[in-house]
């Protein structure tokens, strides 16, 4: 089962979305100033789940494709996938799977 955790690093907080195989699947595009705000952001992401929009982009550092989950109306990025993929189709498929799993993930 996929799950969110909240971690603290360098004075900020972020949620991480963990896949069932134990790797980090996604994180927020920007950190948060408090544990509470990071926790609420993870809860809102899980609540939005299947309504989120999946988009792909080319990572400027690696040149590989990645996915992100965007707000369904504003298209604001809410989550960015960790993995890099050779093709946009691979990234899209992984993002679709993550979107589905996000809706069922618990927040620790």
Q: Predicted regions span which residues?
A:
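Intrinsic N-terminal pre-sequences and regulatory tails
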Residues: 1-5, 107-108
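Short aromatic-glycine-(Arg/Gly/Cys) micro-motifs in beta-strand/loop hairpins
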Residues: 3-26, 58-78
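A short, charged, amphipathic alpha-helix used as a generic interaction element across diverse proteins
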Residues: 33-49, 86-103
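Mixed-charge, Lys/Arg-enriched low-complexity segments
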Residues: 50, 57-62, 66-74, 92-108
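A short, exposed loop/beta-hairpin motif centered on an aromatic-Gly-Thr core
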Residues: 23-35, 76-89
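Tandem-repeat architecture and repeat-register "anchor" residues
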Residues: 16, 27-28, 48, 81, ...
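Intrinsic, low-complexity N-terminal interaction/targeting segments
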Residues: 37-43, 54-56, 65
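Charged, amphipathic alpha-helical segments
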Residues: 1, 45-55
